Regions:
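Conserved AdoMet/S-adenosylmethionine-binding subsite of the radical SAM
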Residues: 2-128
Length: 128
């Protein structure tokens, strides 16, 4: 299991590398052990996991960075080979549960794949 944990100016930790939500039980136990540090905990995720993995740690995480390739179903599935419906369902759940102010969505510019039009649906959340 590889989970990269980065110290950000001694103020918090970021869980990333691969898909950290595959290890949500580990992350939850880790956070329990270090809650008294005062650190903020951030999770980088593609949300391409079962909802239960998100439910397991959603209240332990202070901030979410969501990576996606596009908000168009066909383009998303072509590029990621994953389920757009699963991603979208998890994103909606995250928005409803923690609110847009705790979520940042990153969409890389991929030539010949995505356009502003295909990602403008994300305007209610911070788009980077």
């Amino acid at each position: 299991m590889i989970i990269f944990i980065f110290l950000q100016q001694e103020e918090g930790l970021v869980f990333g590398g691969g898909e950290p939500l595959l290890y949500s039980a580990f992350i939850k136990e880790f956070i329990k052990k270090y809650t008294k540090t005062g650190w903020k905990f951030t999770l980088e995720t593609s949300l391409s996991v079962k909802k239960e993995s998100i439910e397991n740690i959603i209240h332990c995480i202070d901030y979410f960075i969501v990576d996606t390739k596009d908000m168009d179903k066909t383009r998303y599935e072509l590029y990621t080979k994953g389920s757009y419906d699963l991603f979208l369902s998890n994103l909606k759940y995250l928005l409803e549960t923690v609110g847009a102010d705790k979520i940042r969505v990153r969409v890389p510019k991929i030539p010949k794949l995505n356009t502003y039009k295909s990602v403008k649906i994300l305007l209610p959340v911070k788009l980077y």
